[in-house]
Each structure stands twice: as C-alpha cells, then as structure tokens.
Amino acid sequence: MQITFLGTSSGVPTRARNVSSVALRLPQRAELWLFDCGEGTQHQILRSDLKVSQLSRIFITHLHGDHIFGLMGLLASCGLAGNVQRVDIYGPSGLNDYIQSASRYSHTHFSYPIKVHTVRPGVIYENDEFTVTCGLLHHRITAFGYRVAEKDRAGRFDIEKAKELQIPPGRIYGQLKRGETVTLEDGRVINGAELCGPTEIGRKMAYCTDTIYCDGAVELAQDADVLIHEATFAHQDSEMAFQRLHSTTTMAAQTALAAGVRRLLMTHFSPRYAPGNTIELKDLLQEARAIFPRTDMAYDFMTYEVPRRREPVFSSVSSSSV
C-alpha cells in the first residue's frame, strides 16, 4: 500500500500545491485508487510514476469543486487513451448527476464502463484483500470520509519444515498455508497454523476531508496505521474553521490522538500560510506535533509506504518539505 499525494492545497491551487487528490497504489493487485479528484489531477498523475492504466476506483468525499473539478477531464482522457478497463466511482448523492450532465453538455462518450455508486455509511466495497467503509463527516454539505482496511493474512508458510515432516506437496500445501488442519493419507493430523509464521495484520488507512472535528472521523480512523486528515487552518484561526466547517491543525491532531492512529499526515492547507506570512506551514506542523508527535505535513508528490505492523512504523515518509 503506497500513498501518493497529488494535491495538498485547499480551495485553489498554488504554485507548489495542487488541489485535493490522493492516490493509493496496490502493487499486489496492479490497481490504482484515487481519493478525490481536484482540477489538474490528471496532470499530476502524468508528472508522477503512477500508471493511469491501473486506475480502477475513485472515491469522492463531497461535491465541492476543489475535490471534483478534475474528474471529468481524467475520465475523458482515460477513454481517449483506451487503456482503462473499467472505473467504479463512489461518492455522495448528486455525483452521478454531475457526471451525466457534464458528459451530455460536453458530448463526452466513454469507451469503457463507468459505474457510479452512491454511498451510505458502512461497507461500500469488499474483495478478498480489502474492505472499504465510509462514514459521515461534518462539513457545509454532505461529506464522507473513507477507511481502507487490508484483511489479515496467514504468516509465511515454512516449506522446509513441511518437507521434513514428509508432507506431500500440492493442494495440501494450499490448505496448510491458510492455517487449516489437514489429515494425511497415513493418518497424521497436521495443524497448518504450526507451519506458518505470525499472522500478518492488515494495514488500515483513513481519509478524512473536508470536516471539522467530529466523532465520525475518529471512528473511521480507529487504530489506523495512517490517517490523512485535512488541516486547513492554524489553531489561532479556529473561528474561521468553525464558520467554514474545516479543521485546524489541532483538530487533526486531536482526531489522531483520540483514534489511536500510528501516523498522521496532514493535507488541504489554506494558501494563506505561504512563506513570508505571519504564520507559515512550518508553524502548523509544530502545532500538530505538540499534541500528536507522529505527525507529518504532506506535500505534492510525497509518497508514503504504509508499513506492516511487524516493520518499523516511524521511518516510511520520504524527505519532508513544507
């Protein structure tokens, strides 16, 4: 599970930051999932090492322009390139109307299947490896956060030990790898769990934007390996945050702390905190770390490899930039 930030600015792009989009690359499935698709997202993908041909799912949090204005352009380009098999899009009520209207008035025809799923709180997608759930956030319009949970899997199978026990290879190995108990032809009963290493705990990612501090975000982020949370405002601008129903750095950090996450990655920063201003982005990072030390500030094209629990969890962010 590798996260790439394609846009980390709120509202409008800046010279250094595009508007909201986050890519989740799943190498084991050769799939690419997007979370939000602000204007210019396809340009950001082209500037990265991501493969648009692997795009299979897009999750939209809400229908504000800085989160959806890049959607139609990306979908249309995928059709012209002819290298996308199918795209499933998940989002709030009204998303399908937006796509249908835009395609009708622009005479855009897609050469591949697109399925729009109107989401409600709960499980919205599941396969043999992942479960995706969504929950309501607290914003000016209906907004959803998303949680991607990788399923636990059996530990590494000890083939050498199986050979020592003279267990015949083949279908039985598959059963033992899954931790099943198998009776051999000679009558021996083999417990697969005894031939496997420790269970590999599935990784969890939560994506919460746009929102003010709310229980819904805490619930989605519970015990996550990484929480991506908006931090539009500095703490001293909390009055504006309450008026516009956006989060401050301290709200993002409090969410991470309450949810017991392992890493907080802040995004969706107001352009008002540009270098040279009274408050700069580095100040926002210090505010959050005062509450939740394991915080980093995302920047465009930053990648983060979500570590497995058996690996070190504090050394997976590429070099920082604010």
UniProtKB/Swiss-Prot annotation:
Keyword field: Endonuclease, Hydrolase, Metal-binding, Nuclease, tRNA processing, Zinc
Entry's cofactor comment: Binds 2 Zn(2+) ions.
Active site: D66 (proton acceptor)
CDD domains on file: RNaseZ_ZiPD-like_MBL-fold
Keyword Isomerase found: no
Highest taxon, organism lineage: Bacteria
Enzyme class: hydrolase
EC number(s) from the headed UniProt entry: 3.1.26.11
Residues that coordinate or bind Zn(2+) 1: H62, H64, H139, D210
Signal sequence, renumbered to the chain: none
Catalytic activity annotation: Endonucleolytic cleavage of RNA, removing extra 3' nucleotides from tRNA precursor, generating 3' termini of tRNAs. A 3'-hydroxy group is left at the tRNA terminus and a 5'-phosphoryl group is left at the trailer molecule
Positions of Zn(2+) 2 binding: D66, H67, D210, H268
GO molecular function: 3'-tRNA processing endoribonuclease activity; zinc ion binding
Record bears the keyword tRNA processing: yes
Cofactors that this protein relies on: Zn(2+)
HAMAP family: RNase_Z_BN (MF_01818)
Subunit structure: Homodimer.
Function description: Zinc phosphodiesterase, which displays some tRNA 3'-processing endonuclease activity. Probably involved in tRNA maturation, by removing a 3'-trailer from precursor tRNA.
Family: Belongs to the RNase Z family.
PANTHER family, alphabetized: ZINC PHOSPHODIESTERASE ELAC PROTEIN 1 (PTHR46018:SF2)
The protein, known as: Ribonuclease Z
Lineage of source species: Bacteria, Bacillati, Cyanobacteriota, Cyanophyceae, Nostocales
Gene from which the chain derives: rnz
